[in-house]
Swiss-Prot record:
Domain writeup: The J domain is necessary and sufficient to stimulate DnaK ATPase activity. Zinc center 1 plays an important role in the autonomous, DnaK-independent chaperone activity of DnaJ. Zinc center 2 is essential for interaction with DnaK and for DnaJ activity.
TM segment ranges: none
Alphabetized PROSITE patterns for the sequence: DNAJ_1, DNAJ_2, ZF_CR
Functional note: Participates actively in the response to hyperosmotic and heat shock by preventing the aggregation of stress-denatured proteins and by disaggregating proteins, also in an autonomous, DnaK-independent fashion. Unfolded proteins bind initially to DnaJ; upon interaction with the DnaJ-bound protein, DnaK hydrolyzes its bound ATP, resulting in the formation of a stable complex. GrpE releases ADP from DnaK; ATP binding to DnaK triggers the release of the substrate protein, thus completing the reaction cycle.
Gene: dnaJ
Cofactor comment text: Binds 2 Zn(2+) ions per monomer.
Protein name: Chaperone protein DnaJ
Top-level taxon: Bacteria
């Protein structure tokens, strides 16, 4: 049976932030945990499915691989023989179950960890030549960076955060609701277990400041529209010393005046005059490496495709290079002189009769078909 989409399993959008994913998983864990669900026979499977989706979508590297390759990224042999282990162990679910079941039954006495910085996205436009050959570009992005005065602590230099007097450093407080004692994040320190009594004058206790930074981004040869390049740790700074998020550079290749790209192949149209189409000859055609000669055989028709091997795009993942496919278009002459028109009339007259049928077999076949069509109508 085919696996369901991980975003569909958790009921979140594909651009959902980590906190939305965590919230959705907590809801499903509450609903389908085997210790709490006895009526639904499929509860255990649904629980495992949600757990697997959570593990993948809260790991930035695994999520990026899933967004690009789907479930194939975690199948045996996927992602070039390595990939990422899918649905197995390795994830720390203590933060989830401490929240879900600790809130209900009174467990999970621990501080809320400082939030990791948000991931950022930058849309980069490339010419076809840049995408095919690779390029290094400098980009400037607005972001939240670690405060250079307090170094991310949020406290004024010479001071430090102090233990929260409300929760005494636990990050959580207990509230009584009927027969139950429920734990929730401390409203004073917001679950951190510490407060800043003397905040930094520059960041006002946040540990982060708004700024722009310039980065040098190396674009590998062979990228195409839709490819993403991940720059680890170049997203927004985390709260109070937590890890920074990542920066994702989204590639968009601009339209080219001559070539169209499909995968690793390039396509172009090559106009030729009807004399060359009939008699044959040699023309120069453009490639990304310069001009090359293309031999046109006699009696070439519009739409004829000529393949030039190895003149396309080299795969971004290595391996063979694509081809250039040139589609011939026979051009009808315009702005003819009287002499040229007279020569064409003489040529046209030579096509009359049996000789003409031999010169234009497709036209004869078409006319025979039209004649048969009308004959059938009159019967």
């Amino acid at each position: 049976m085919a696996k369901r989409d991980y975003y569909e399993v958790l009921g979140v959008s594909r651009d959902a932030e980590e906190r939305e994913i965590k919230k959705a998983y907590k809801r499903l864990a509450m609903k389908f945990h085997p210790d709490r669900q006895s009526e639904d026979k499929n509860a255990e499977e649904k629980f495992k499915e949600a757990k697997e989706a959570y593990e993948i979508l809260t790991d930035a590297q695994k999520r990026a691989a899933y967004d690009q390759y789907g479930h194939a990224a975690f199948e045996q042999g996927g992602m070039g023989g390595g990939g990422f282990g899918g649905g197995g162990g390795g994830a720390d679910f203590s933060d989830i179950f401490g929240d879900v079941f600790g809130d209900i039954f009174g467990g999970g006495r621990r501080q809320q960890r400082a939030s990791r910085g948000s991931d950022l996205r930058y849309n980069m436009d490339l010419t076809l030549e840049e995408a095919v050959r690779g390029v290094t570009k400098e980009i400037r992005i607005p972001t939240l960076d670690e405060c250079d005065v307090c170094h991310g602590s949020g406290a004024k230099p010479g001071s430090s955060p102090v233990t929260c007097p409300t929760c005494h450093g636990a990050g959580q407080v207990q509230m009584r609701q009927g027969f139950f004692t429920v734990q929730q994040a401390c409203p004073h320190c917001h679950g951190r277990g510490q407060i800043i009594k003397d905040p930094c004058n520059k960041c006002h206790g946040h540990g982060r400041v708004e700024k722009s930074k310039t980065l040098s981004v190396k674009i590998p040869a062979g990228v195409d529209t839709g490819d993403r390049i991940r720059l680890s740790g170049e997203g927004e700074a985390g709260e109070h010393g937590a890890p920074s998020g990542d920066l994702y550079v989204q590639v968009q290749v601009k339209a080219h005046p001559i070539f169209e790209r499909e995968g690793n192949n390039l396509y172009c149209e090559v106009p030729i005059n009807f004399a060359m189409a009939a008699l044959g000859g040699e023309i120069e055609v453009p490639t990304l490496d310069g001009r090359v000669k293309l031999k046109i055989p006699a009696e070439t028709q519009t739409g004829k495709m000529f393949r030039m091997r190895g003149k396309g795009v080299k795969s971004v993942r290595g391996g063979s290079q694509g081809d250039l496919l040139c589609r011939v278009v026979v051009e009808t002459p315009v702005s003819l002189s009287e002499k040229q028109k007279q020569l064409l009339r003489e040529l046209e007259e030579s096509f009359v009769g049996a000789a003409g049928e031999k010169n234009s077999p497709r036209a004869k076949s078409f006319l025979d078909g039209v004649k048969k069509f009308f004959d059938d109508l009159t019967r």
